[in-house]
UniProtKB/Swiss-Prot annotation:
Subcellular compartments: Cytoplasm
Stored SUPFAM superfamilies: DNA/RNA polymerases, Lesion bypass DNA polymerase (Y-family), little finger domain
Record-given protein name: DNA polymerase IV
Cofactor annotation: Mg(2+)
Pfam family of the protein (one): IMS
Site (Substrate discrimination): Y15
Species of provenance: Gluconobacter oxydans (strain 621H)
Location, primary (coarse class): cytoplasm
Taxonomic classification: Bacteria, Pseudomonadati, Pseudomonadota, Alphaproteobacteria, Acetobacterales
CDD domains registered for this protein in UniProt: PolY_Pol_IV_kappa
Domain of life: Bacteria
Amino acid sequence: MEQRRIVHIDMDAFYASVKQRDDPSLRGRPLAVGRGEARGVVAAASYEARRFGVRSAMPSVTAKRLCPELLFVPARFDVYRSVSAQIHDIFSRYTPLIQPLSLDEAYLDLTDHLGAYGSATLVADRIRADIHAETGLTASAGVSYNRFLAKLASDYRKPDGLFVITPAMGPEFVAALPVDAFHGIGPAMARKMRALGIETGADLRERDIETLTRHFGKAATFYYGISRGIDHRPVVVNRERKSLGTEQTYLRDLTSEADAHQALTQIAATLWGSAQRRQLQARTVTLKVKYADFRQITRARTLSAPVPSEEVLLETGQSLMAPLFPFVPGVRLLGLTLSGFHAAESPPCDQMELLF
């Protein structure tokens, strides 16, 4: 039986990193996304904050006590969703088999979609490079022959790393790990396992299926498998996304119409290419503008028929942008989004030689 090629991509401190990207004055500073008041909770923490022990789901007062210099910023889910759409568009260039787990992580099945690269490891590295080039953010990747091990691998070299667990490595890699490092085993279950003398993957592997079933019920089969590096769960493709967008943040604020039109031309070309790769037809075009003072506005137009060409996409975007001139203050980000689309049937992909 041929081994699968599964990649798990996990963005590094996603919410906090997006804020630090968009506000350079915050780079290198301990940052928490959430409310800083007495009853607030940390939604996410930058790596600078994590060095002090600040973690997500931690009460804000506890986080502030651990890190007095901690700066709290509000969550910006519209921005996170927009960046997530960019990232998932990058994924779709390499495989249609994508299972998003959240805005900032996903499984990709590359088994039959290695393309000219011939290697899931090379594809994963290319995806990470594309993400950094197009969003300014870093991602970690894990490559393996099943979902469980791919997710473990993506954690192994964080942040901004890549790790591969081959079939030869899998069982012993799992054996050496403490059970509370296993995805799918939460704190309560880990405590229960430790009470039974199960501290590591090797300990878990020593228990037969009957013993595991007696203590863990229906979950026993899953635990029995992962302790041996076995996980047959497929990458489950979610329903089609409802929108597809491209945006760009500029080092120098856009102030002139000429610069803005040139920038929008590039964005429209990128977005149209993404839609064509996915064979999507859309009727609604949305323009996003973020000013230098971080104010943000959107304008949308729904056409009577699907956007037929890159030229019409650009013309629609420009007509939405025209009433916004002059740009005062300048514009630091422009974006276009397509929505209200459906996907045509995709042609079958070529079967490639399977290599890690």
